[in-house]
Amino acid sequence: MRSVIIDGYVDEPACLGVQPYISPYPRYIAGAMIDAGAKPRDVHYYTIDQLRAEPRIIGIMDRADLIVVVAGLTVPGRYLNAKPITIREVGDFIARYNEKILVGGPIRLSHESVLRSECVAEKDLEARVFDRLTEKSETDRWRRTSEIKRWSVKGAQIIQRHPHFPHIMCEIETYRGCPRERHCSFCTEPLYPHSSREIDDVVDEVRALYESGARYFRIGRQPDLFSYKRIETNSGFKPDPTAIEKLYRGIRRAAPELKVLHMDNLNPATIIEYPDESREIAKTIVKYHTPGDVAAMGVESSDPRVIHENNLQIYPEDVIKAVELINEVGSMRGENGLPELLPGINLLYGLKGESKRTYQHNLELLQRIHEKGLLLRRINIRKAMRFKETPLGETKVHIEKRLFYHHRETIKRRIEVPMLKEIAPEGTIIKEILTEAHDGRFTLGRQIASYPLLIRIEGILKLRVFMDAAVTGHSHRSLTAIPVERSAST
């Protein structure tokens, strides 16, 4: 049984799988294939970018018994060295390979006519693959955590087939699905059933990835890391700092010489409701992680009307308190040149109840944060994507383009660039920059990290090598720098 996995890339509210990230999807699928009896050497993995660049891969697909395509973007993104698969490309694959292809991932939420096919998995693609190989069944179902326990370990070795291995970031899942009773109007995470993995299972997966050569990890596949293994009490659910400490300690023991351990996704409401537990968790993260970490918070809007109409759960005063707590614990500078742990804020436009006043509300929130001397490592301003399965999908909100782009540029100029000058002042040595592309007389590079800064290094330098550089200037989300001699400890 020869199988080919095509990684068309995924980007979801609580999962990133666009290179240099590799999401859990292709790893679980490879594990399901091996668990079903396939030999590891017969499981092939290619990214969509590889396929475009190397026509020979089509011949391998032609000879395969099963082709599995992972794809889907449910949040908008811009990528430096990757182009996600297009609907047209998926349609071409379906037409060419017909009964021997399966397609899945968040692309299942698309309502494009070309995807109205029995080969598109409406639930978990990895479960559909396993059942097809073991039971000859084509019934859609959700996978079980006991299956992921096996598949995550058995499929870990597939990362060695990635074209950028070992310089890839492994996205790690702790749980998925939103545990809230009322969900944000736009989010696709509630469309997954809520399921939580055991700590030992996550650690075992990290160990398997590490033994396969992985050195870069992000605990990012969950909507709120601070709520992982939360405890039920008489007054509701509260975070469990002991569980987070066990998770991080276990990962460090399983991967003793890892180079990056970062996180993603923090619900600021957790901090507001449980500040003591949240502070303890943040301290644990700083103890075990690597510097340059970002706790991205889904604020989405500070307009009271928008907050109410879209089931958001946090108001401006609460946002500021959450930002203060993360700054208090994590703003000290780390050994790689960047602060240990800083918050990020996501702002979303095109929500119900939005007006011109919304833009002013959001700008005022960011100005207040800046005036307090607090730092935000990232401000992510984006337009909402609509899916029929979500409440927002039933409405249409007009976004005035000129207003949106003017607002975004204002935030860059007034907030982001001044903060970036504090986060990485001139003269700061940024370490472990991987050079990725050329742009005029500059070489573009980034650290392998969660939300890495783009660094424009003077000179045309060799690509795909690590280097250190000294900061010489600042712009929105990027630094200019000059190369410096790497330290002996790097």
What does each model-identified segment do?
Residues 400-490:
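Terminal RNA-binding accessory module
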Residues 111-116, 276-282, 351-370:
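Catalytic cores of alpha/beta
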Residues 67, 101, 120, 217-220, ...:
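Hydrophobic residues within beta-strands of alpha/beta enzymes
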Residues 13, 77, 108-111, 182, ...:
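Flexible glycine/acidic-rich beta-alpha junction loops that bind and position SAM and/or redox cofactors
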Residues 178, 202, 297, 379, ...:
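Conserved, mostly hydrophobic/aromatic
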Residues 87-90, 202, 244, 278, ...:
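Aromatic/hydrophobic pocket-lining residues that form the small-molecule binding cavity
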Residues 4-6, 207-354:
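Conserved SAM/AdoMet-binding glycine-rich loop
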Residues 2-201:
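Acidic, low-complexity intrinsically disordered segments
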